[in-house]
Amino acid sequence: MSKIISQDKIFLEKEGDDYFERNGPSVNQAIYKAIKFLRPKKKDTIFEIGCGCGSTLKKAQENFKSQVWGIDTSKKAINYAIRKHKLKHVFTDTFLNFTAKNKFNIVVSGGFLYVTPDKVLPKTINKMINSVKKDSYLVIWDYDTPVSYENSWKYNNKVKSYKRNLVNIILKKHPKLYLVSKILSLKNGKKLDSYNNSINIDNILSVMIFRKIS
């Protein structure tokens, strides 16, 4: 079994559930604000990769009446989404293994790229972009660094985490995407109002909104 497959398997078998238990059923405010910024309509479809227990999708569904889909590697989180939030289109799976029948108006990458190995990152990004309808949007919430490097994940030493300059990686290969917005924040969710060399780049996340123009 390859290292790439085993990392996915670790999340499906244990780490996905452990992540849900550590973080609980909270709304990801950074992602929700990005969705709100795009003002989805009732007929629009939203697909979140790494949706957790669906709290963010549920809030978007209630406030915008949009149709929502989601996947996550945590069985416990998806069961919560079905039982508590009454979401119908949520599934336990990895993104590369999941097959969607349709494309979406908004695709959200909910913080899973930093545990996506380098060898499958191009395939993953391509699939995300292909999941977005023309003239629609890709939202990415993830770690954001000026250089690429990897760490051992502190919760499981068998898992690697990857920090990258995602905007450069994405726009270099996909010039027909347009960067609408990028907002930096720290791990605690606090927005960065200034930037200097004293900031630990390992703690920086960003919300990036891309428009697919063709």
Predicted segments — roles?
Residues 111-115:
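Short catalytic micro-motifs in class I SAM-dependent methyltransferases
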Residues 1-45, 52-99, 116-123, 127, ...:
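Class I (Rossmann-like) S-adenosyl-L-methionine-dependent methyltransferase catalytic domain
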Residues 108:
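A conserved beta-strand element that flanks and buttresses the S-adenosyl-L-methionine
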